[in-house]
Amino acid sequence: MRSLRCLLGLRRAYLVWPILLLLLVGAALTALLPPAGDQGGIDVLGALRRATSRKESPARGRAEEEEEEEEQRFTIVIQTYNRTDILLKLLNHYQAVPHLQQIIIVWNNIGKQTPLKLWKSLQPHPVPVVFKEQASNLMRNRLQAFPEIDTDAVLMLDDDTLLSVPDISFAFSVWKQFSDQIVGFVPRKHVSTPGGVYSYGSFELQDPETAGGDKYSMVLIGAAFFHRRYLQVFQDQPAAVHALVDETQNCDDIAVNFAVALYLREHSAGTVKKPSGVFVKPVDLRNLEKDASSGYQGMWHRPEHLLQRSYCLNRLTQIYGVMPLRFSNLMISQFGFPSYANHKSSA
C-alpha cells in the first residue's frame, strides 16, 4: 500500500510539472507582446477579438450579411506606362486571386492603344478588367476616385510588382482588422536631423537622435491595401500638394501617408494617434522590371529620386504646418502574428 501511494504521488508530480511549465511559457509569451501604445496606437489583440466575436455572432440580419459580403471583396488598381508585356503577365496572374472584384488599369501610355482588344479576344476571364485612359502621364492619376470602384478595399500595385496570391489573401485579412490604415508590404520612415530637417529613409536607417532602427512611419502604396475613401481624401488635399507631386513626378505615396495620418488625427478616438500604415511582411514579392521588353526603368532609378523624397517630406510639412507621421515597429507576419518588426533575412 505504501509503495502504491508513492507511485500515485510520483504520477501526480509528473502531471503537475508539465502544466506549470506550460503556464510559465504562456505568461512569458504574453509579457513579450507590446502594449497598444508601443505600436503607435494599434490594438492588435483588440482587433483580433473583434474579428472573432463578429464571426461567432449567431443571428445576423440580411443587410448585415450583404454588408459583410461587400467587405469580402476588393479592387486592384494598377497604373502602367510602357510595360504592356509585363502588364499582361500580371493580369493573368491576378485572375487567380480570391475575393477580387475587378482590376482597374490606369493607362498612362498617352496616344497608344490599350491591349483591351487582345484581352477580350482571349476570353473568358474570371475577373473583369477596366482600362482608364488618361489625358496626361501624371503620377497621381492612379489616385482618382474612379466611379467603377464599388468595394471599400483597394489594393494598389505598381506595374512591375508581382505579389503572391497567399500574400494578397493574408494582407486582405489583416486590412479588414485595420481598415482605416494603409496595410502594405513596403515600409519607409522619415528621420529628423538635429537641424530640424527631415530625411527620407529605409526601414533600417538609424535615427541620429535615438540611434533606433527597425521602425517605420509610412507604408508605400505601390503594394498596399487601403480604404477607397482615401482616394477622395487625397483629391481634397490642398492644391499645393497636387502641384508638388506633379512637379517632382514623385512622392504621391508620401502625400497619401500624410493625408491618411491627418485624417486619423481628426477621426481617431482617444489620445494615442495611429500611424498611417501597418506593415505586413511579404513572403513572395517580386520586381519584374527586368522582364520588360521596352527596357523602361522606373523613376526610382533616377539619381535624384531619394533627394526628391526628402524634399517632399519637408515641403509637405511646410504645406500642412505639422509633421503628422507617427512611428510604429509592428510587423504582422504569416508565421508569427503579431511580431516585432525585423524583416532582415537571416540567410
Give the residues covered by each predicted segment.
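C-terminal catalytic/acceptor-binding lobe
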Residues: 2-52, 67-73, 79, 85-92, ...
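Structural motif
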Residues: 75, 153-155
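Short, acidic, metal-binding catalytic loop of nucleotide-sugar glycosyltransferases
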Residues: 90-102
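Short internal beta-strands
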Residues: 103-108, 184
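A conserved acidic beta->alpha catalytic loop
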Residues: 107-118
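A short, glycine-/small-residue-rich helix N-cap motif at loop->alpha-helix starts
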Residues: 134-141
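Active-site nucleotide-sugar/metal-binding loop of Leloir-type enzymes
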Residues: 143-153
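Conserved catalytic core of nucleotide-sugar-dependent glycosyltransferases
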Residues: 146-147, 157, 161-245, 249, ...
